[in-house]
Regions:
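Histidine- and acidic-residue-rich, metal-dependent catalytic cores
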Residues: 3-400
Length: 400
């Protein structure tokens, strides 16, 4: 299957930014700005082509394991967000995660060491000579955006950023990267970091070349995305990958070709990516949602649609993913699609999402039996919400 992988990773970076904004208060578009600054610096150092693409990918995903770390190690006690040597744990997790992704070049240790300081005072005690260049570039870009991104990109901030780099050269950041940043960013260029056009500039520098992926690679990519979505809340900690696996199984059971199976697997993994834009106070509310809270929750499917819309030639998979709460009678959300507007895969995803949600165990409930879940699906089909033919296929496919 041919995919715009960098576009997918960009969408993933938006999801990460949403989660980080809630948990550790990074500024909007943090990952993309880190990627843009990194690419501009790398150009000054003679890096180009596939290496530049891989640097952009690493920069977009530099904090891919932060939410995983908070969930697993800190049990979501955000007051204890990692400092100093503790930062190394999320770097280790992030390094392991990106090994699943299809890079063009060797990016070993780039994520692992992206919080190392030039003088060896970082979490792993590595000096700048021992750290991959990509790690050092991302480290500088990340530091600047975390320190100044939320304050806006003005002449005053530019002067403060330059002052910070000069003051910390040789201790926190290395001279090679400081020089590259100062060569890449004059004041007018720095000011564009606060404008929407910097994203356009990023993709002009890094053409999004499509890659041919084997199904095993697609499964790894999908698992990576699903993990980011599912670590948003322990209430749905395995839901996305469960939907992906069910989508694969049902698609094969119904006789679809392997490309359709691959697309359905990816759509299943991504179907709830929009939930990253919904606060955990709603996702994890133990009681019934208020009308206003449910209205916010319903937006997650629309967020999925819009997040995935930025990926080239992804409309089909986007729709299969985003329409999982639509109903045949037009009473679903977010777009109120009717039967005439919903194709077979979109109808399948609606059934699969409900079936998986009913049968999986969560902290507040035990999963239902196959028989009980199918009773509910048939009730929804009889109301005109779900496709009866597909409900029957679900019943037969997942029995036993």
């Amino acid at each position: 299957m041919v995919l715009d992988v960098l576009g997918l990773l960009s969408a993933c970076s938006y999801a990460l930014d949403c989660v980080e904004a809630e948990l550790v208060h990074v500024s909007d578009k943090h990952a993309k700005r880190v990627a843009y600054m990194s690419v501009c610096m790398a150009e000054q150092l003679g890096i180009s082509d596939e290496s530049l693409q891989d640097l952009a990918a690493c920069a977009l995903l530099h904090d891919n394991a932060l939410t995983q770390y908070i969930q697993e190690e800190l049990h979501k006690d955000v007051a204890n967000v990692p400092q100093a040597s503790q930062v190394g744990i999320h770097c280790t997790l992030g390094e392991k995660n990106i090994q699943r992704l299809p890079f063009h070049t060797d990016v070993k240790n780039v994520i692992l060491y992206h919080h190392e300081n030039a003088n060896g005072s970082g979490p792993f005690g590595k000096t700048w000579e021992e750290i991959p260049l990509f790690s050092r570039i991302i480290h500088l870009s990340d530091l600047l955006d975390r320190a100044y991104g939320a304050k806006g990109f003005t002449e005053d901030i530019f002067n403060k950023a330059c002052g910070y780099l000069h003051k910390n050269e040789g201790t926190v950041v290395d001279k090679e990267c400081v020089d590259a940043f100062l060569q890449a960013f004059s004041l007018p260029h720095f000011l564009t970091l606060g404008e929407d056009r910097f994203e356009k500039n990023l993709w002009e520098k890094i053409p999004r070349i499509k890659q041919e992926l084997r199904f095993a690679q697609i499964e790894e990519l999908a698992s990576f995305f699903a993990q980011i979505v599912d670590y948003k809340s322990p209430f749905t900690s395995t839901h996305s990958i469960g939907v992906a696996e069910d989508a694969k199984r049902l698609s094969r059971y119904m006789g679809f070709d392997e490309e359709t199976v691959e697309k359905m697997y990816l759509a299943g993994a991504l179907h709830d990516i929009g939930k990253v834009a919904v606060g955990n106070e709603i996702l994890e509310k133990p009681g019934r949602l208020t009308e206003d809270e449910f209205a916010v929750m319903k937006h997650h499917a629309a967020y999925t649609y819009y997040i995935l819309s930025d990926i080239d030639d992804f409309d089909e998979i986007r729709d299969w993913a985003a329409f999982h709460h639509e109903r045949l009678d037009g009473t679903g959300y977010p777009f109120g699609k009717t039967a005439a507007e919903l194709n077979t895969q979109e109808r399948m995803m609606a059934c699969i999402d409900i079936y998986q949600a009913l049968t999986e165990s969560r902290p507040y409930k035990q999963g239902m039996s196959h028989e009980k879940a199918c009773e509910i699906l048939w009730d929804m089909a009889n109301k005109g919400w779900l496709d009866e033919t597909i409900v029957k296929q679900v019943e037969d496919c997942f029995r036993g």
